Amino acid sequence: VGLDIGSRSVKVAEITETKNGRKLKRFGMADIPPGAIEDGAISDPETVSQIIRQLLKSANIKETNVALSIGGYSVIIKKINVQTMPEAQLQETIHFEAEQYIPFDISDVNLDFQILGENENNPNQMSVFLVAAKKEMVNDYINLVTLAGLTPCIIDVEAFALQNIFEANYDIQDENVALIDIGASKTSLNILKGSSSVFMRDVALGCLQINQKIMSLLDCSYEQAELLKFGEASDKMSAEELKQIVAAVVTDWCTEIRRALDFFYTNYPDDQIKRIILSGGGANLAEFRQL
């Protein structure tokens, strides 16, 4: 069972293995009240755990072992270069290497790494993805799912979890692909060269911006703004006015995404991105897909 806990909703999916491959058996989704989770930090675990319990019940999911992912500014992903060495030796020295790059006390984080291969510019070095997550945040998510009566078996990083889903469903080995996930409060960009991630960036922009603008103009609730955002008619705002609000916010998203892509092209001038894959709630907005 996969559990996706966002800042405005929680999703659950039960996957089974069949002779024809993996099959989606059950799926469910429920809203989370504003403020319960902000930038990945859980402020109201009791409410969120109860929502998860109800969601599992309504989706008729009885399996209690779950895989989940974490994100936000308590998670750091950094591509670094280190002296070429065996993986076992790097395992012993990674804390020392990480101290140069992690803006937290190294004793307060869980560390992991993935060796990407030889550094293209220095054959005596290798490129490594360094991942650090604050222990406090990891423990908060473990406590949350435990409160919901579940057992966390896998805790991944959101960007890597999305990459795994993509690679499991699409056989694209030689293309450069940009995975863009537009959530409620942040947009994540992950650029893949084949099966390797070479560039990641998060920007604090998301669908919540559109809702906030609509709420401010119409003095309405978040739920009403959500319906209007996806095209429900309103006597307080014309379709053209709504389209302009959405277009203005989406233009900001695209500006930040282009900046990130420009940074990628600066570092990889000979590479071209052949395909863009969109996910998250923002992918449902026609204005964004068109830009």
Task: Please provide the spans of the model-predicted regions.
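Short hinge/gating elements
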Residues: P34-A41, V75-M85, L116-N119, N124-V128, ...
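Gly/Thr-rich phosphate-binding beta-strand-loop-beta motif of the actin/hexokinase/Hsp70
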Residues: V1-D31, Q50, N65-S69, A168-F199, ...
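Helical "lid/coupling" subdomains associated with nucleotide-phosphate turnover
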Residues: S49, M215, Q224, K229-F230, ...
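Non-catalytic, solvent-exposed interaction/assembly segments
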Residues: V1-E97, N139-Y141, L147-T151
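Active-site neighborhood for divalent-cation/phosphate handling
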Residues: S69-A168, R275
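Phosphate/pyrophosphate-binding loops at sites that engage ATP/ADP/AMP, CoA/4′-phosphopantetheine
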Residues: I52-N65, A148, C220, R258-K274
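Glycine-rich phosphate-binding loop plus the immediately following alpha-helix
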Residues: I37, V138-N164, S195-M237
